[in-house]
Amino acid sequence: MSLFKKDISKKELEKAFNEIQMNLENNYIDLAIKAYKDADLMLNNYHKESKIDEKTYTKFKARLDIFAKRMEGYSHRLNVKY
């Protein structure tokens, strides 16, 4: 695995996390939920395919958990967990 590919993966993850942050700040509930799910899927795929190392995975997973905590109860429906 080249260092260049890992940098690209990190940049793509940063972009996905920035999208979540932007949607949360603008109170776009549906878009924030979709961006969260997409980022979670991307993070897990990159980890499974060894495109990111364990340290990077742990760092991004912690950030994703913070977003999950902030998004508790985000829905147009009641009592929905993500």
Short names for language-model regions:
Residues E19, N23, M42-E49, R70, ...:
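Amphipathic, soluble alpha-helical interaction motifs
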Residues K37-F60:
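Short, charge-rich amphipathic alpha-helical segments embedded
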